[in-house]
């Protein structure tokens, strides 16, 4: 479990937000509105779970310091992804109100900004929509990355399959 560092002042939160690419498209007024709402900065030690698969906590997180790794319970030794400063995670559960589908562990000492639904409900509708649009952009980019990886994997699998056929044909030729 992480340690809550503090509830940051609006000025401290604004400084953090200004350094995060996710918030680059927001105006100064929108960033200020966001910074004035309650949020938490939480620190996690090395190898500590930030998010656990199956959890029903519906917050979204932004990595402020350190690195984190993504895993799944069915593949515990496989690192699906490594998250770096500025990474957004937890947005799927936040948007769909469904349990977490992955684990996120601090790879090193990490700080995250945790944002919950109560905070989002206090935002002006335009700011809230912009946040949702940014979430969608993150999801679209991830989907594009997954499609690229899937195509690469398919090409590799076809090459392996063809190599197996070629090998079998050569093996059969030698045995004749």
Residues covered by each model-derived region:
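Cytosolic regulatory regions built on CNB/CRP/Popeye-like sensor folds
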Residues: 1-176
């Amino acid at each position: 479990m992480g340690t809550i560092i503090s509830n940051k002042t609006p000025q401290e939160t604004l400084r953090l937000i200004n350094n995060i690419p996710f918030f680059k498209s927001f105006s100064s007024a929108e960033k200020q509105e966001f910074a004035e709402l309650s949020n938490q900065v939480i620190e996690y030690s090395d190898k500590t779970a930030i998010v656990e698969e199956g959890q029903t906590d519906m917050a979204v997180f932004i990595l402020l310091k350190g690195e984190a790794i993504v895993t799944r319970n069915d593949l515990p030794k496989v690192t699906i992804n490594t998250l770096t400063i500025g990474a957004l995670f937890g947005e799927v559960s936040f948007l769909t109100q469904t349990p977490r589908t992955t684990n996120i562990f601090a790879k090193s000492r990490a700080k995250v900004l945790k944002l919950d639904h109560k905070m989002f409900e206090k935002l002006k509708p335009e700011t809230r929509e912009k946040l949702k649009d940014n979430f969608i952009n993150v999801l679209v980019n991830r989907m594009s990355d997954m499609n690229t990886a899937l195509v690469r994997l398919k090409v590799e699998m076809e090459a392996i399959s063809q190599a197996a056929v070629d090998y079998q044909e050569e093996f059969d030729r030698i045995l004749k």
